[in-house]
């Protein structure tokens, strides 16, 4: 959003864009982007078990994110130097990487089942709340990258936590050997094709 280039210094805006770049890489590592092609294929394959599959994929993503976070915790000093970001931003990055796949799974399911009305409402809500929350935080606490990031992560928490709870309650499946194996095999075949 162009307004943030005016409210934040060049250095702070640069830090924010570095954060976004590393977040994309972290999200690939922690979610394996299972919510893309793999998830769509499974929606067709497991037509009667979509809730269970969705919650199991969410569980797999949480386990992978937890494993990568544990690795980070043991080597945090090394990663802070490589990423050139403070620990607080890296922790927010992990929180966002933990939460955002739930929204992606939910959105993918809505699209697959042609339920666009609620998807559009949630998308518009997020599109409005992200800059508003960030603007408020930047105005109150100064034009820092941390305030911009806190605004986005705060909105992610408000939207994604209820989705995570809803999907786990509905699917009641954290681990499924069949679903996890199928997802990882599909992911391997997709990634090797790229």
What is each PLM-predicted segment?
Residues 17-43, 97-103, 162, 194:
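Small-residue-rich midsections of specific transmembrane alpha-helices
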Residues 90-94, 120-169, 182-185:
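Hydrophobic alpha-helical transmembrane segments
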Residues 1-5, 28, 72, 76, ...:
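Structural signal for membrane-spanning alpha-helices in multi-pass inner-membrane proteins
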Residues 25-29, 62-70, 82-106, 120-124, ...:
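Alpha-helical transmembrane segments of multi-pass membrane proteins
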Residues 8-18, 44-56, 66-94, 140-149:
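Membrane-interface helix-capping segments at transmembrane helix termini in multi-pass transporters
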Residues 3-25, 145, 181-189:
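Interfacial/gating helices of multi-pass transporter permease domains
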Residues 5-13, 26-60, 111-117:
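Transmembrane-helix boundary and interhelical linker motifs in polytopic inner-membrane proteins
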């Amino acid at each position: 959003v162009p307004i943030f280039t005016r409210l934040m210094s060049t250095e702070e805006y640069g830090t924010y864009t570095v954060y976004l770049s590393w977040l994309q890489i972290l999200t690939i590592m922690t979610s394996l982007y299972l919510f893309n092609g793999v998830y769509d294929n499974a929606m067709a394959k497991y037509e009667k078990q979509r809730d269970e599959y969705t919650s199991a994929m969410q569980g797999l993503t949480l386990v992978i994110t937890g494993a990568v976070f544990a690795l980070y915790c043991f080597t945090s000093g090394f990663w802070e130097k490589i990423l050139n970001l403070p620990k607080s931003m890296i922790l927010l990055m992990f929180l966002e990487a933990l939460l955002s796949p739930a929204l992606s799974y939910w959105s993918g399911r809505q699209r697959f089942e042609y339920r666009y009305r609620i998807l559009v409402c949630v998308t518009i809500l997020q599109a409005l709340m992200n800059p508003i929350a960030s603007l408020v935080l930047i105005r109150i606490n100064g034009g820092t990258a941390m305030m911009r990031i806190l605004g986005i992560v705060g909105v992610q928490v408000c939207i994604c936590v209820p989705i995570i709870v809803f999907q786990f309650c509905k699917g009641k499946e954290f681990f499924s050997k069949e679903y996890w194996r199928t997802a990882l095999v599909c992911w391997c075949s997709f990634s090797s094709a790229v």
